[in-house]
Regions:
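Conserved, structured core segments of small domains
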Residues: 1-99
């Protein structure tokens, strides 16, 4: 299973339909995080772009899963790139305390 980063381009303006779907979208994302499919999910402060780090068999499988996001039809673009290295504090072992 590969590891991919997905770059999302969000719409310039969020209409009522988009905003109404946010809770359903967040629940969908949270479920994938709990299942270990999504490792990280981030949206830029200006709400124009997003990044999702996720597991998938192929880039096509990852794109297919992104197409199931409740907000998928509003995305202006989706880029899927397979990662060679993904390192973060969250993926490291906890520090040992020698009390």
């Amino acid at each position: 299973m590969g590891l991919y980063v997905v770059t999302l381009r969000l719409p310039d303006a969020f209409d009522e339909e988009f905003v109404a779907l946010i809770p359903r979208h967040r629940a969908f994302i949270n479920n994938l995080i709990e299942e270990g499919v999504i490792l990280s999910y981030a949206i830029s402060a200006d709400r124009s772009r997003g990044w999702v780090t996720m597991h998938g068999a192929t880039a096509e499988d990852v794109r297919g899963l992104v197409e199931q996001f409740p907000l998928a039809r509003f995305l202006q673009s989706v880029e899927v790139d397979e990662l060679f290295v993904f390192d973060s504090a969250a993926t490291r072992l906890p520090k040992i305390s020698l009390n």
